[in-house]
């Protein structure tokens, strides 16, 4: 279910302040965050945000096609390594 249009998109306050500070200085640096639920807004375009996936921070460069999505969508948390090899010895 999507968020109501009457409400604004959720962005963590600490993340929004960091983005606005970098935009006023016109600097580019990696922003580290644990806020996977924050929505990507147009002021974030061009910044690199390191999003936590539960183990480490993955740096993600924000482009205009990502606007409206959540940060957590671009940092996968599960690491599927494939099913076990079909081995007759393991069946016994």
Curated annotation (Swiss-Prot):
<keyword id="KW-0150">Chloroplast</keyword>
<dbReference type="InterPro" id="IPR023575">
    <property type="entry name" value="Ribosomal_uS19_SF"/>
</dbReference>
<dbReference type="GO" id="GO:0005763">
    <property type="term" value="C:mitochondrial small ribosomal subunit"/>
</dbReference>
<keyword id="KW-0934">Plastid</keyword>
<dbReference type="GO" id="GO:0019843">
    <property type="term" value="F:rRNA binding"/>
</dbReference>
<protein>
    <recommendedName>
        <fullName>Small ribosomal subunit protein uS19c</fullName>
    </recommendedName>
</protein>
<dbReference type="GO" id="GO:0003735">
    <property type="term" value="F:structural constituent of ribosome"/>
</dbReference>
<keyword id="KW-0694">RNA-binding</keyword>
<dbReference type="InterPro" id="IPR005732">
    <property type="entry name" value="Ribosomal_uS19_bac-type"/>
</dbReference>
<dbReference type="GO" id="GO:0006412">
    <property type="term" value="P:translation"/>
</dbReference>
<comment type="function">
    <text>Protein S19 forms a complex with S13 that binds strongly to the 16S ribosomal RNA.</text>
</comment>
<keyword id="KW-0687">Ribonucleoprotein</keyword>
<comment type="similarity">
    <text>Belongs to the universal ribosomal protein uS19 family.</text>
</comment>
<dbReference type="InterPro" id="IPR020934">
    <property type="entry name" value="Ribosomal_uS19_CS"/>
</dbReference>
<dbReference type="InterPro" id="IPR002222">
    <property type="entry name" value="Ribosomal_uS19"/>
</dbReference>
<keyword id="KW-0689">Ribosomal protein</keyword>
<keyword id="KW-0699">rRNA-binding</keyword>
<dbReference type="GO" id="GO:0009507">
    <property type="term" value="C:chloroplast"/>
</dbReference>
<dbReference type="GO" id="GO:0000028">
    <property type="term" value="P:ribosomal small subunit assembly"/>
</dbReference>
<dbReference type="Pfam" id="PF00203">
    <property type="entry name" value="Ribosomal_S19"/>
</dbReference>
């Amino acid at each position: 279910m999507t968020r109501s249009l009457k409400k604004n998109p959720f962005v963590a306050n600490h993340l929004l302040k960091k983005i606005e500070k970098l935009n006023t200085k016109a600097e580019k640096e990696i922003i580290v965050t644990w806020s996977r639920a924050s929505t990507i807004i147009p002021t974030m375009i061009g910044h690199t945000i390191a999003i936590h996936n539960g183990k480490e921070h993955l740096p993600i460069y924000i482009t205009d096609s990502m606007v409206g999505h959540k940060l957590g969508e671009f940092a996968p948390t599960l690491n599927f390594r494939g099913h076990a090899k079909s081995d007759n010895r393991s069946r016994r």
